[in-house]
Amino acid sequence: MIENNLVVLSLVVPIFTAIILVFLGQRYRAKRYVTLTGLVLTLIVAIINLRNVYVDGPLKVELGSWPAPYGIIFLLDSFSAMLIVTSIIITILITAFSSTTAGIDRERYYYHFSITFMLVGIIGAFTTGDIFNLFVFFEVFLMSSYALLVLGGTQIQLRETVKYLLVNIVTSTFFVIAVAILYSIVGTLNMADISEKLSTLSNTHGGLLSIVFILFIFVFATKAGAFPMYVWLPGSYYAPPFAIIAFFGALLTKVGVYAILRTLSLFFHNTMSFSHYTILFLALLTIIFGSVGAIAYDDTKKIIIYNIMIAVGVILVGVAMMNEAGIIGAIYYTIHDMLVKTALFLLIGVMYQITKSTSLKDFGGLIKHYPVLGWTFFIAALSLAGIPPLSGFYGKYYIVQATFEKGFYVSGIIVLLSSLVVLYSVIHIFLKGFFGKPKGYEPTQSVNVKHATTISIIAVVITVVFGLSADLLYPLISEAAQSFYDPSIYIESVLGGRS
């Protein structure tokens, strides 16, 4: 019982941290320390939870002692536990990086509160067993993201916030409509219970279920930045400071991917012929359009932003396969991309601190004065491209294996070719930004640059360690994958598991 209550504690600690931050006024230094302390405590709880899940299996919490499917359920399985640990590590890195890059004017107000509360929404989305509460937690982290996007009040931020707000209002509306239709069919909001009931109703309510599927895919693909709903992403992610871009790019899109994977495996497992072809089609177009964007620009921000799309597409190819290799690959690649995108956005943030520009046309020759920064970026670039034995390799290997097992050879080839596009785009930054004649900046060894560089190096080291630990983590990831290609495991954990 104590172990199960720790699941809720991973939500309670950041909530109380956010409440404390409200009462600190404009004392930005105190806010930094309180935020980092709260995040470290949350990480400790999350690591304990991950260990407990690995040893004892999924942990279930029934709020108010109301049993499933009647009460509010939180379920922590291997995948959600890994995602939560990764998310907290990233949040700690971004908070530390923000102290020298976000600007004191932002930190004085609701910057740290918004980061902490956004983490609450993300953790809640990863653990809820209720489809309506998934909507609630989506709204929690979206409201925080609105604040983070607009803080600073620059013209581009205000313009992109309006677009971002409109997109999310529309998708949230369709989310509620989808939940309402689903509830009218099955009479329950518990995701495991919905899955059980749909297994007997899919033949009699096929038309309505197709509408629900389309609505869910529209909502979650928009959140994930998948084709064709990605149009908001390049502009909205370009506007805020680098720390916030890293936060959004690493975490927000992955919540959308998680929601697709969870609902597809539970609600539409019996309609794979339609649903998985739809997701595969969107995934491949996401890779293609992301690849075009990644090689079309000389702007460091835009190159990495479009690489987010490529990664989302690759993950969704694995999800669409819905077999063991595909899901294992999707899980590996999701965690890899969360870590490596954080590292890359922080690294180009350091480059911006030095050069005051994101355009590769405005600077070059950074390797002469910043060799550590340059070679750290090179390692992160190789990891992003999936060069073995770095972290990007393992996820793509399993995803390509899954496509060939299912006979989707063209899909596998597109995933492989995307690695070349990714490698070209990031090596383009490396060669043009770090080599050539130094121009457009005055070399500086300021404390701020050194601090930001150190945090970026730590992020890359964590990414490398994840890649080198792939074999060690395989049993945990394999266990996490089982509940998706065999949804009866998740259903049993919720409706018949221990509490």
Curated annotation (Swiss-Prot):
Superkingdom: Bacteria
* Assigned keywords, A-Z: Antiport, Cell membrane, Hydrogen ion transport, Ion transport, Membrane, Sodium, Sodium transport, Transmembrane, Transmembrane helix, Transport
Q: What is its main location?
A: membrane
Q: Where are the transmembrane segments?
A: 5-25, 33-53, 72-92, 109-129, 131-151, 169-189, 207-227, 241-261, 277-297, 303-323, 327-347, 373-393, 410-430, 457-477
| GO BP, sorted A to Z | ATP synthesis coupled electron transport; sodium ion transport
According to the UniProt entry, its GO molecular function terms are: antiporter activity; NADH dehydrogenase (ubiquinone) activity
- Asked if S-adenosyl-L-methionine is a keyword of the record, the answer is no
The identity of this protein, by name, is Na+/H+-antiporter, MnhD subunit
- Source species of the chain: Staphylococcus haemolyticus (strain JCSC1435)
The text of the family note is: Belongs to the CPA3 antiporters (TC 2.A.63) subunit D family.
Organism taxonomic ancestry: Bacteria, Bacillati, Bacillota, Bacilli, Bacillales
Assembly description:
May form a heterooligomeric complex that consists of seven subunits: mnhA1, mnhB1, mnhC1, mnhD1, mnhE1, mnhF1 and mnhG1.
Q: How does it sit in the membrane?
A: Multi-pass membrane protein
